[in-house]
Amino acid sequence: DVELNYQDVKYIKNHCKFKKEYVPTLNKQGKCWYLVFPFEDKVEFQKVDIQDQVICAVDLGLNNNATCSIMQSDGTVVGRKFVNLATEKDHLYKALNRVKKAQQNGARRCPTLWKHVNDLNTDISRKTAKEIIDFAVLYNADVIVFEHLDTQGKKNGKGKQKLALWRKQEIQKLVEHK
């Protein structure tokens, strides 16, 4: 039996009046169950000439999470931002060291420790995507451009784990979705 708060129903009635409604779904996260109401809203993009476009160019890196620069169509750089989530990376590397210590003592899989590592990694990618979008909105960018990253066959040597944990495609999908 599912009950809804009055505020939730009021919010849906006020904010989702003119949006296309889909079938509600019941999702489980951990031990909690959530009722999700999906809606679709049509957004129309502005038609801007190529000469008047403002571009947000994003370079996803291993050391800095992202390097963003705002450029005009003639090539002049208007703004620049380095997204480096240092504390989150420190938490991630500390969690990886916990996994390493646990696996040194025996051939254990450590699923809870790996889940913590993966959750930290998705959190880093979400925060990076949010920083990129906020920077693009700040300068009213018309287009967000990512570099083409192909890492197949290049995972060897010292930075192999760092490259394996790099979530470049997830960041691109999150930015595209938002």
Task: List where the protein language model places each region.
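Charged, flexible boundary elements
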Residues: 1-53
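Positively charged, helix-rich recognition surfaces that bind polyanionic ligands
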Residues: 31-178
